């Protein structure tokens, strides 16, 4: 006997998949979902189980049959006959059951249904459905598949609602990892905060001041050397801080689909003001769509000028509350610890307004903050639990790796057994090192976690061979037509600030079919790797005016499939974007040399011109190819073939090591020893 799936067995025995799964659990048989395969032993057990329940159903049919047969004056000895008699009685009982079943209010299906299956779901005879389809101009048999529209049309005719079931594979748990829990299960959770800003403006010193420890002094050159996550308690409430090495790591995680941050603290030095990296940090935070709190640091310096900082930040739509805006500005001195309490209170205030919640009573889900391979402990991963509760011993899938949580260590180095929402923990027990930004999910069963992890690793390998789908000017028009694009994200880099402003202003005016241009970042100087990472995370196109991408930017753009457009004239940029939006971008061609022939002899013919007797030395010569005449290594003419012959016959092509006769359009000065090079123009796949 071949294996059968849960839903197939349920359908065969006219019971719901849910009831069958409940029955299997009562029989201590583990099934994960309705797609689980049942082996012969389990099927036999189920057959025995449902056969013992049949008499009660038969009794019901017996009562119904007696009523029907009394009306028709036919009766008795119902169960005495065997073989065909039993089958006839079963069929009769089945017909009576069909007659007494009420029409459902709603039916569900997945993918498609055959005419017979639809008839069963609607409690109608297949012939009735076939008749309705015929009236609609559809010739169908009982086993013919019907699409969604046809199913809805027939069901609506009976006044029955239709719902399509979307089956999501557990290997793609990212698709349902962020599903909303019921409101009554949600509990308040700590906010997750990222500190960003220009180099040397005091990001690590601020975090150090918050944690009351001297981290900065121990780090080389005052630069954060790894991504850490720490939790602090303020007024009996917790706040989780992510310590990132600049905004690039923050955006790399977002590019991998991980939205970990709730609030961004933008650190700006009161004596320095807004710097290039400050602007980048603002754009990264805005692209992530998270609230920004501005911490005006170094207020202890004599040159501190907080008003100038406020004035400069208004240009980037960060208007302080004191000036009628909605951005919170907090003056602080991280090195002296002044204003820190006020900053923490503001974080709690934003948390209260935003109402960050999670469900602690479920299996944990979240994101990898950092991961590394330790010689003694094996794979170590810092995880941020975003929903549910992670426990020691939980089977877990992290990106394409899997394992069981062997040990958990908190941010202060203590071993813990459980970690709730917004809690950062360091775990061991994974089979390989995951990447920062990978999502994780805990499961009930280690076997299932292993299967899902292995499947995801295989899928990732296959996906690597394919190309990532990123927005490019070539497919822009198609995506606009399909309604996939409502706004085009652009990153603009130029050689001088004036060019940046002029180009950004011109681009913002473009509006084609209601699709507008959004400039998510501008800057002066070469296109950097940071620009490419932001473009990848935001699905943006990079425009360079009089600037080039550096080596790292080129490499990253190739890996991430980010479209870079380089120009030297502003109106050409505008024209290209508009043309792409209207689907009129000119195709790009490249030349491909397909063959060469050597002129061995020439013949002059009246009214024809010079005929070259040639020998094909390489590749092939085709009738529709372009040709160039090369004499002594110099190209002396470029044009088209007029005729191509083998003996007296016109031919479409002549292959290598064959002789042929050639005439060239509007050119007769052919000489022995000339090389005729044939080429074609091929459209470049962008």
UniProtKB/Swiss-Prot annotation:
Residues 69-81 have a biased composition (Basic residues). Residues 297-300 are annotated as: G4. One of its GO terms (molecular function) is translation initiation factor activity. One of its GO terms (cellular component) is cytoplasm. Gene3D superfamilies: 1.10.10.2480, P-loop containing nucleotide triphosphate hydrolases, Translation factors, Translation initiation factor IF- 2, domain 3. Keywords: Cytoplasm, GTP-binding, Initiation factor, Nucleotide-binding, Protein biosynthesis. It comes from the Bacteria. Pfam families: EF-G_D2 (PF22042), GTP_EFTU (PF00009), IF-2 (PF11987), IF2_N (PF04760). Coiled coil: none annotated. Residues 197-204 are annotated as: G1. The keyword GTP-binding applies. Residues 61-98 are annotated as: Disordered. Residues 333-335 are annotated as: G5. One of its GO terms (biological process) is translational initiation. GTP binds at residues 197-204, 243-247, 297-300. The keyword Nucleotide-binding applies. Residues 243-246 are annotated as: G3. Residues 222-226 are annotated as: G2. It is found in: Cytoplasm. Belongs to the TRAFAC class translation factor GTPase superfamily. Classic translation factor GTPase family. IF-2 subfamily. One of the essential components for the initiation of protein synthesis. Protects formylmethionyl-tRNA from spontaneous hydrolysis and promotes its binding to the 30S ribosomal subunits. Also involved in the hydrolysis of GTP during the formation of the 70S ribosomal complex. This is Translation initiation factor IF-2.
């Amino acid at each position: 006997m071949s294996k059968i799936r849960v839903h197939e067995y349920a359908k065969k025995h006219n019971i719901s998949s849910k009831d069958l799964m409940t029955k299997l659990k009562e029989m201590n048989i583990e099934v994960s979902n309705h797609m689980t395969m049942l082996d012969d032993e389990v099927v036999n057990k189920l057959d025995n189980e449902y056969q013992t329940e049949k008499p009660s159903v038969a009794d019901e049919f017996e009562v119904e049959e007696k009523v029907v047969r009394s009306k028709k004056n036919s009766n008795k000895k119902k169960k005495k006959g065997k073989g065909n008699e039993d089958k006839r009685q079963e069929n009769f009982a089945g017909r009576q059951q069909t007659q007494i079943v009420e029409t459902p209010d709603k039916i569900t299906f997945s993918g498609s249904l055959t005419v017979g299956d639809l008839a069963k779901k609607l409690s109608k005879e297949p012939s009735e459905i076939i008749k309705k389809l015929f009236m609609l101009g559809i010739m169908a048999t009982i086993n013919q598949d019907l699409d969604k529209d046809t199913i809805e049309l027939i069901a609506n005719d009976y006044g029955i609602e239709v719902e399509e079931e979307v089956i999501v594979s557990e290997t793609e748990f990212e698709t349902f990892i962020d599903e909303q829990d019921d409101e009554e299960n949600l509990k308040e959770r700590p906010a997750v905060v990222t500190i960003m800003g220009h180099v040397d403006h005091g990001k690590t010193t601020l975090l150090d001041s918050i944690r009351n420890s001297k981290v900065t002094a121990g780090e080389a050159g005052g630069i954060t050397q790894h991504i850490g996550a720490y939790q602090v308690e303020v007024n009996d409430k917790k706040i989780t801080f992510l310590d990132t090495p600049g905004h690039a790591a923050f955006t790399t995680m977002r590019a991998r689909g991980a939205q970990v941050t709730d609030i961004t603290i933008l650190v700006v030095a009161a004596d320095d003001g807004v710097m290039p990296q400050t602007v980048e940090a603002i754009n990264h935070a805005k692209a992530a769509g998270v609230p920004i709190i501005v911490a005006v640091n170094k207020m202890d310096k004599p040159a501190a000028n907080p008003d100038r900082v406020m004035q400069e930040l208004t240009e980037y739509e960060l208007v302080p509350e004191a000036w009628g805006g909605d951005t919170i500005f907090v003056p602080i001195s991280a090195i002296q610890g002044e204003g820190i309490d006020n900053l923490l209170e503001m974080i709690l205030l934003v948390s209260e307004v935003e109402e960050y919640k999670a469900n602690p009573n479920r299996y944990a889900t979240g994101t990898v903050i950092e991961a590394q391979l330790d010689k003694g402990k094996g794979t170590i991963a810092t995880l941020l639990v975003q929903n549910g509760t992670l426990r020691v011993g939980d089977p877990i899938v992290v990106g394409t790796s899997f394992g069981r949580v062997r040990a958990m260590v908190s941010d202060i180095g203590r071993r813990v057994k459980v970690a709730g929402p917004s809690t950062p923990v360091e775990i061991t027990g994974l089979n390989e090192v995951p990447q920062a930004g990978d999502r994780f999910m805990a499961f009930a069963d280690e076997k299932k976690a292993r299967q899902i992890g292995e499947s995801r690793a295989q899928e990732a390998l296959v996906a690597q061979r394919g190309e990532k789908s990123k927005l490019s000017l070539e497919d822009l028009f198609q995506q606009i037509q399909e309604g996939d694009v409502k706004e085009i994200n652009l990153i603009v880099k130029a050689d001088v600030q004036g060019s940046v402003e002029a180009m950004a202003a011109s681009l913002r005016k473009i509006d084609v079919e209601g699709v507008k241009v959004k400039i998510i970042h501008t800057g002066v100087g070469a296109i950097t790797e940071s620009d490419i990472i932001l473009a990848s995370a935001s699905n943006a196109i990079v425009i360079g005016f009089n600037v080039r991408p550096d080596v790292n930017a080129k490499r990253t753009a190739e890996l991430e499939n980010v479209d870079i457009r380089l120009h030297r004239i502003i109106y050409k940029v505008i024209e290209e974007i508009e043309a792409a939006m209207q689907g009129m971008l000119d195709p790009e061609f490249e030349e491909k040399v397909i063959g060469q022939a050597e002129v061995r002899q020439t013949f002059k013919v009246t009214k024809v011109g010079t005929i070259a007797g040639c020998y094909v030395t390489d590749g092939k010569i085709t009738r529709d190819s372009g040709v160039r005449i090369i004499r002594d290594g110099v190209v002396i003419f470029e044009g088209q073939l007029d005729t191509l012959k083998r003996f007296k016959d016109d031919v479409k092509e002549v292959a290598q090591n064959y002789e042929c006769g050639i005439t060239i359009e509007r050119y007769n000065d052919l000489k022995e020893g000339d090389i005729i090079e044939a080429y074609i123009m091929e459209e470049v796949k962008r």
